[in-house]
Every structure is written in C-alpha cells, then in structure tokens.
Amino acid sequence: MKHSVSVTCCALLVSSISLSYAAEVPSGTVLAEKQELVRHIKDEPASLDPAKAVGLPEIQVIRDLFEGLVNQNEKGEIVPGVATQWKSNDNRIWTFTLRDNAKWADGTPVTAQDFVYSWQRLVDPKTLSPFAWFAALAGINNAQAIIDGKATPDQLGVTAVDAHTLKIQLDKPLPWFVNLTANFAFFPVQKANVESGKEWTKPGNLIGNGAYVLKERVVNEKLVVVPNTHYWDNAKTVLQKVTFLPINQESAATKRYLAGDIDITESFPKNMYQKLLKDIPGQVYTPPQLGTYYYAFNTQKGPTADQRVRLALSMTIDRRLMTEKVLGTGEKPAWHFTPDVTAGFTPEPSPFEQMSQEELNAQAKTLLSAAGYGPQKPLKLTLLYNTSENHQKIAIAVASMWKKNLGVDVKLQNQEWKTYIDSRNTGNFDVIRASWVGDYNEPSTFLTLLTSTHSGNISRFNNPAYDKVLAQASTENTVKARNADYNAAEKILMEQAPIAPIYQYTNGRLIKPWLKGYPINNPEDVAYSRTMYIVKH
C-alpha cells in the first residue's frame, strides 16, 4: 500500500537521491510527432493557489504547476520531489534535503525558505485557506494555535537550516509524516509572485516550480499548460502541451472523448458502462479508489439536527441496490466511511451490513415516528448536490427511497461548483452530496474529517467521544491499536449518523489506447502529466 517508508524505534533514514518519477519511455517505443494531451476535469478550478484549492478540478491542474517535497509513483508510493532525501530519529523532528537544481519557472532557485514561507502562509488566518487544517493534522508544531489566532505564523515548527535543508518539528511522533508532504496544500509558492498582486495566478503571472507553466486560461472553457524549461527533470518531460477541459456533464465529456477531442475523461455516465465496454474495449477503466461518496446531514439546524431523523434517512438508503443497479461499475456499498482499500484498516462488520434492507426500513420508520414525523406530518427537506448527471441520478434514486419507505418529501437542488461550495461552507443545506478522496493512505484522512474543529466537517458534527477516540488513535504505536480506535470511531458515526456513506469509489475513466504512462492503479488518483506520453497511432 502507500506507506512505503519503514519505521523503527531508533534512527530512521530515507535516501532516494537517484530516484525520480517521470515519463519512462521503453526502448524501441515510437512516439507520436504531436505530443499534445487533452484532459477532462469535472469543473472549472476554483483557484490555482495551492493554499486556496479545495476540489479535484483545481488539484489536478495544480499538480502540474507546482511540486512539493515528495511525489507519488504509479502505485502511490512516496518518491523524491523537490527533496532528495529525508530523515528522522524519532518521527517527530524531520529533516529534508532539497535538490540544488530545483528552480522556479523564472529560473530562480527553490529554497527551504520558500517552503517556510508557504507553510506559514497556509496556516495564517489571513490567508483563509480551506486546507489550513491539514498542517494541524500533520502535527506541525503550533499549527493549530496559529490557525486559532493564539500564535503567530512565524512560530510554526518549520525552519530553513540553510538554502537546501528544511527542518520540521511536530507536536507528536508521526511515522507517516513524509507521506503527508505529498499533499498539494504543502506545495511551495514563490513569495514575490504571491505578493505581486491579486492576479498572480493568471497566465503570464503565475510562477510555479512544477513540470508545467500556465500558458492560457479561458474560464469555463480550457486551461493550457506547457513545459517549464527550468523544471529540474524537464529533460524527461515528453508532453509538450496539456489542455484541461472543465466539463461537468459526464455525457458531454464522453461524447467529446468518442469524437476524439479528449484523451482522458475524469468519469463517464454510469448508464453507459456496458455499452462503452462493448464499443471501446480496452479504453474503460474502473479500479478501486481511495474515496467514499456520501451524504452529509446538517446536524446544527433543521430536521436533520435530530439524530433519529439522520439515522432513519441513512438506514433507508439501499446501498446494495445503489451499487448493483443504479451505478453498476464495480463500486462497493459503503457500510463505513473509511474505504476497504485503506492501508492499516480492517473494518469490523457493520450491523447495517448484517441486516436486510426490509429490516433497515422497518427500524427507520420507527425512528422517524419517534422523531414526530409520519403521514400526518411528513418530513420535508432539501437535498443539495453539485451539477452532474451522476449526482442527479443518485439523488433521484435516494429521494425515491426516502419517499417510498418514509414518506419524505424531498426537494432536489443542484448548484454549480462554486455556488455549491459556498452553500456547503455556510451550512445552507439540510442534506448535501459530498465525497472524500484520501489525502494520504491511512484511515485518519477520512475519520478526522468529522472531528469538531475540522474545517472539512461539513455536517458540523460535534461529539466529544468521537474527538477523544481519534486523538487516542494518533498516539498509538501499533497498527492493531490504531485499527481498534478507528473501528470505535466508525461505530460512533454509524450510531450518530452525521453522514450517510453510500458507496466506495472506483476510478472510472476513459483513456485512449495511445496514451501511456497514466498511473491507473494509484489509489489516490494522483496523475502528473509529466509521466505520460503518446505513442504513434
């Protein structure tokens, strides 16, 4: 699985100077003359600032424009990025050595101070980063205090020992800390670039340190990137132009793919799965992904503030029917929030999983009646989702289940991505579609999302027992002990139902047969354009 770094009680040293993850073209391969790729993304990126990114549309582009201390290979294992080696004697104080040929797109060196500035900016309340919590999750000293306004950004536990040595101090030992540094939130930004003005992320202005630079952007139409000639491994970059097309309708993206306008789609309509398998064999992929599709309930206001209502709604979602009939592309029912493919997680059987849907429906009716709802007083609520045919399809199916089994009147509401994010962040919903794809391959990436102080806690769930068991998990020294804590946390989620996990993701997409180097088996779907190339066809 993803945790490739071995941990011992004494000295820990990882040295990978000679390794890199780039396009590896086999000897004898005949490349196409035109190395231009068109990638589909599901929506217009909300921001190209790593500290302001929140969703996959922008993250996919940001991974081409910036590079962190480490990268992931095709299996999700950690490989060098800007850092060539890292070490720790106690899993608490980490030292990273940066490569001396890492440069920004303007040719200036990438230094340890760039990382200090960027990470301090991430946690600075003035930045309003939706991912500031990630620094606290990683346990960087004083991160949470800075986020809470109780300390200043310069007190963050990160220091530039010299231009090429970065020292990070954690508030507790964390064996998988290096894995976390692959996250986009920890990508460096150039101080002079950020401070040049509000339009620093526009084409011609943005100065990244990734394999590509932003050449063109037409909002809601396309983003075009071309090789960064100053990138340290640019000699191995094969693709000379990558165009990202934001299309939130899977059918439209699939139509463009079949017409030859797109080389990779981020998804495809579920109802086309069998037809696509027949029409374009070898181009349809559905490997498991480190992600869960779920509905979040507003636990602070409205009818879903009542735990009985939330639990009844969760129980009447027929997850077996959803995965087998509504979706039907290899997804698994989500009886818990943490996906089965997560490293270090062995789930205990859920009571829901051991009951028939008829039994679940019967118990749900009793719960809803106890909450004061029934034929004379039907439950009314709004189900919000971001615009997408697949999301709509699932919402219609769930609304039908709730109406048929509980008599619930459901109003379906769809919003474009940016509006949906605003509604989600302000708590303007009863029930909202959500998903989480792990930021790293360990159960805490999912379960900490529901802790009371987490900015990603969409449902506003506040449960001291839940917070306590996850805090305990972070101090455990063995996988077995952590697994017990994680299962205890999952039990609380099942009983309190701040969310209703629906299914575990598969990474459904279409890929042209002449495109090579796509890391289809990366569990987190981390795909850098610089590893890909097009063969003659």
Curated annotation (Swiss-Prot):
It is found in: Periplasm. The complex is composed of two ATP-binding proteins (OppD and OppF), two transmembrane proteins (OppB and OppC) and a solute-binding protein (MppA). Belongs to the bacterial solute-binding protein 5 family. Residues 1-22 form the signal peptide. GO terms for molecular function: oligopeptide binding; peptide transmembrane transporter activity. GO terms for cellular component: ATP-binding cassette (ABC) transporter complex, substrate-binding subunit-containing; membrane; outer membrane-bounded periplasmic space; periplasmic space. L-alanyl-gamma-D-glutamyl-meso-2,6-diaminopimelate binds at K42, V54, L56, Q289, R424, S435, V437, D439, T506. Keywords: Peptide transport, Periplasm, Protein transport, Signal, Transport. Its main location: periplasm. This is Periplasmic murein peptide-binding protein MppA. GO terms for biological process: dipeptide transport; heme transmembrane transport; peptide transport; peptidoglycan-associated peptide transport; protein transport; tripeptide import across plasma membrane; tripeptide transport. SUPFAM superfamilies: Periplasmic binding protein-like II (SSF53850). Part of the ABC transporter complex MppA-OppBCDF involved in the uptake of the cell wall murein tripeptide L-alanyl-gamma-D-glutamyl-meso-diaminopimelate. Is involved in the recycling of cell wall peptides. Binds the cell wall peptide L-Ala-D-Gly-gamma-meso-diaminopimelic acid. Can also transport ordinary alpha-linked tripeptides such as Pro-Phe-Lys, but with much lower efficiency than OppA. Cannot bind typical tripeptides such as Lys-Glu-Lys, Lys-Lys-Lys or Ala-Ala-Ala. Coiled coil: none annotated. PANTHER family: PERIPLASMIC BINDING COMPONENT OF ABC TRANSPORTER, PERIPLASMIC MUREIN PEPTIDE-BINDING PROTEIN.
